[in-house]
């Protein structure tokens, strides 16, 4: 039984990596994705920026008991060997902890994908938990370059841009679309 956490900044290719690994996995598997508005258990998709997609079961972060029941149903009723979960940063850490425990007790591989930090450079609680409980060799960090024009440094921060400037405060979860850039330390703090 293996648990992995693949993380990176916005636009680094986490969903693409999930889809590639999911398609290469020969075990009986299911893909799931945290969702802010869709009902738990509805069928949707995980789609990467390159247009590739895979069918997925949506898990609403607000429905903790339902999320765990859906996961248990796939493990025990459908005999799933591997679970791939995208956008884990949206979950409360209690859901991640419960999924991790159920998967471990059932000898099911679970592969978590998501952001580690918010636009304010604070850890998402679910991601912080995963960084603590998953073995270092099973944490995969996808890197990318700074998106500031002319900068060649490695990006380290998800920056929410408001009126062309880095926003350092505000609600973590927004319903409307916002512009984000992956920035290096120098460009983030300038």
Regions found by a protein language model. Name each.
Residues 2-5, 29-31, 80-84, 109-111:
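Residue-level preference for the first positions of well-ordered beta-strands
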Residues 86-88:
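Walker B catalytic acidic pair
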Residues 127-146:
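A short helix-turn-beta junction within AAA+ P-loop NTPase domains corresponding to the substrate/partner-engaging
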Residues 144, 149, 182:
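Cys/His-enriched microdomains
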Residues 21, 93-102:
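A short acidic, amphipathic alpha-helical/loop segment
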Residues 103-127:
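Sensor-1/coupling segment of RecA-like P-loop NTPase cores
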Residues 90-92, 119:
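Catalytic P-loop NTPase motifs of RecA-like helicase/translocase cores
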Residues 1-73, 118-129, 152-154, 166-190:
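Conserved P-loop
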């Amino acid at each position: 039984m293996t648990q992995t956490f693949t993380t990176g900044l916005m636009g680094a290719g986490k969903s693409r990596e999930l889809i590639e690994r999911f398609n290469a996995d020969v075990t009986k598997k299911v893909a799931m994705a945290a969702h802010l508005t869709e009902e738990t258990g509805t069928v949707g998709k995980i789609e990467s920026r390159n247009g590739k997609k895979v069918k997925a079961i949506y898990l609403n972060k607000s429905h903790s008991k339902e999320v765990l029941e859906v996961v248990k149903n796939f493990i025990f009723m459908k005999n799933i060997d591997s679970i791939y979960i995208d956008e884990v940063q949206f979950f409360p850490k209690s859901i991640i902890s419960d999924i991790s425990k159920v998967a471990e007790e059932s000898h099911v591989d679970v592969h978590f994908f998501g952001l580690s930090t918010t636009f304010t450079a604070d850890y998402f609680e679910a991601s912080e938990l995963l960084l603590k409980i998953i073995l270092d060799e099973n944490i995969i960090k996808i890197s990318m370059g700074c998106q500031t024009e002319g900068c060649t440094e490695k990006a380290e921060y998800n920056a929410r841009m408001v009126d062309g400037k880095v926003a350092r405060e505000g609600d973590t979860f927004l319903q409307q679309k916002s512009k984000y850039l992956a920035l290096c330390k120098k460009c983030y703090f300038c």
